[in-house]
Amino acid sequence: MASGISRTPATGVTAGGGDDEEAAWLHALELISGFTVSMTLKAAIQLGLIDALTAAADGRALTAGELVAQLPAVDDAEAATSVDRMLRLLASFNVVRCSTEAGPGGDPLRRYSPAPVCRWFTAGDNHQGSLAPRLMLDVDEDNLSTWHQMAAAVVSGGPSAFERAHGMPLFEYMGTNHRFNMLFNQAMSQQSMMVMNKLLDRFHGFDGISVLVDVGGGTGVTLKMIISRYKHITGVNFDLPHVISQAPSLPGVNHVAGNMFESVPKGDAIFLKSMLLRNDEECIKILKNCHYALSDNGKVIVVDIVLPETPKPVPEAQNPLRMDVMMLNNLRGGKIRTEQEYAKLAMDSGFSGSFRTTYIFANFMAIELCK
């Protein structure tokens, strides 16, 4: 390997040394090619690389060759080179860690180990939840194709980009595409598991509730988690008939089929997790039905991502703002809201009592709307 390489920077310029024009150029390139990180991470998960790095004995860092030995590769040498290049990119984004040593021929040999973020991309502990299914959903071809319709949807109004791409709204499409429906449900259930674990640790608004109604509760997994911690609660899992028909029998949970736009079962408290991502008119209709179903001193507990009032270039703002534009793309009238917008929804729906918020995790908040 040549050792006499030298580099002379342009006069007055040091690489990465504060040239504003260069910094803006590199930022532009990052925005253009950011998808390469998501797609490379997807491939790394599909190949089992993240799981293998996380499961390595005694935290040992592995070479690309050692990782490829576990794969059914046709050409191990070629595959090892490809894996090394993939992990090298992920290391530059702090997805994995990289150390370098001298290889057998004197060339650099890179070893990789998991960075902290890998815990959210492994199959791992089923009770923790994983973001791997969420990644697979977001970069799925059925999702990515919809973004090409975003500009047309903005100009034309009416149908969302998703609806323009697939000829029908998101949830209707899920009913026709079993593969995509399974992908969506797995992503949502895994993310919900993570959020609910944090909610049960940090939110104490379930004390004193006798009957808790989970509107849009799916197969009852969320209620099962709540009741395992608050055993005095009787749960009512409320969802559409075709969902309830698949719900298993759960101790302390009564499954009820219906439509939240028509009526909601009565209870001391009503739980709405990720149900108010719709337009204002639909959200107010849901909340008014909840208000009617509550006992005199009852409350609605909303658990959702909350937007910051001001956009800032920090992850705490970027994450909810990305989600908001995903709602714009996928659902007609869909949106993420600020605290003030939730407060207005509550007032417009008849909730005149206290409005309390508890920060949970990763921009999720628990919002209590008291009757």
UniProtKB/Swiss-Prot annotation:
For this protein, the record's InterPro entries field holds: COMT-like, O_MeTrfase_dom, Plant_O-MeTrfase_dimerisation, SAM-dependent_MTases_sf, WH-like_DNA-bd_sf, WH_DNA-bd_sf
Instruction: For the region Substrate binding, give the residue spans.
Output: 170-188
- Record keywords, A-Z: Methyltransferase, S-adenosyl-L-methionine, Transferase
> Do you know which PROSITE patterns this protein is assigned to?
SAM_OMT_II (PS51683)
Which residues are recorded as binding substrate?
137-143
Q: Does the keyword Manganese apply?
A: no
**Pfam families for this protein:** Dimerisation (PF08100), Methyltransf_2 (PF00891)
Where is S-adenosyl-L-methionine bound in this sequence? Answer: 216, 239, 260, 273
CDD domains per record = AdoMet_MTases
User: One GO biological process from the UniProt record?
Assistant: biosynthetic process
Indicate the enzyme's highest-level EC class.
transferase
Q: GO terms for molecular function, please?
A: O-methyltransferase activity; protein dimerization activity; S-adenosylmethionine-dependent methyltransferase activity
Q: EC annotation?
A: 2.1.1.-
Q: Which domain of life is it from?
A: Eukaryota
Beyond the main fields, what else does the record say?
A: Identified in a screen to identify naringenin 7-O-methyltransferase. However, it does not show such activity.
The family assignment reads: Belongs to the class I-like SAM-binding methyltransferase superfamily. Cation-independent O-methyltransferase family. COMT subfamily.
Provide the protein name.
Answer: Probable inactive methyltransferase Os04g0175900
Instruction: Give the species this sequence originates from.
Output: Oryza sativa subsp. japonica
